[in-house]
């Protein structure tokens, strides 16, 4: 598994006060289309934050059901990518945070009903869209999106995961 660490503040693990964990997945259907979320103006993979007591795979199953209406099978998946951001004084002064994201990949069968979503209030109010982009075009779409979005880290992380998956 590839791991990327962003630590612009040069803080150590001992400096971390809290950890925010999230899990995302690349889901490819039989036609080579990859399920993608567009929220605000940023492309990203479906997934989200872990709730207390959840492991990464449990959170992944829950998030995919909420965001995409897909009953993803619970199984031990091996991540293809881990991205960590270590941030000093975030979100508050004297609080250092580690953002830890694990990225997985799986085949998508059967085709989900994209109209059966259980979105959070925030997702409902963020122009949340779910759709497909073919794997032959997704890198270019993400690069184009990266050039115009305010959410550069989100799109950049998605691009890293897709590149890792497609290599």
Give the role of each language-model region.
Residues 1-24, 30:
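Acidic, metal-coordinating catalytic segment for phosphate/diphosphate chemistry
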Residues 7-16, 88-94, 117-120:
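Short, P/G- and charge-enriched loop/turn segments at secondary-structure junctions
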Residues 27-30, 105-107:
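Active-site beta-strand termini and strand-to-loop segments that position acidic
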Residues 29-67:
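Conserved Nudix-box catalytic region and its N-terminal flanking loop in Nudix hydrolases
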Residues 43, 112-167:
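Nudix hydrolase/Nudix homology domain
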Residues 71-82:
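A short coil-to-beta-strand element that immediately follows conserved catalytic motifs
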Residues 85-117:
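Active-site-adjacent beta-strand/loop module that shapes the phosphate/pyrophosphate-binding cleft
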């Amino acid at each position: 598994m590839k791991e990327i660490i962003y630590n612009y503040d040069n803080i150590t693990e001992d400096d971390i006060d809290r950890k925010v964990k999230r899990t995302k997945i690349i889901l490819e259907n039989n036609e080579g289309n990859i399920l993608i979320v567009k929220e605000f103006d940023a492309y990203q993979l479906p997934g989200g934050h872990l709730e207390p007591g959840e492991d990464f795979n449990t959170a992944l199953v829950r998030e995919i059901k909420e965001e995409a209406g897909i009953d993803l099978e619970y199984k031990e998946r091996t991540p293809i990518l881990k991205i960590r951001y270590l941030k000093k004084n975030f979100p508050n002064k004297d609080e250092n945070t580690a953002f830890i994201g694990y990225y997985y990949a799986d085949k998508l069968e059967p085709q989900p009903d994209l109209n059966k979503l259980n979105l959070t209030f925030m997702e409902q109010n963020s122009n949340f869209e779910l759709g497909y982009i073919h794997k032959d075009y997704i890198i270019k779409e993400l690069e184009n999106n990266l050039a115009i979005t305010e959410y550069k880290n989100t799109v950049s992380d998605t691009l890293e995961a897709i590149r890792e998956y497609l290599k």
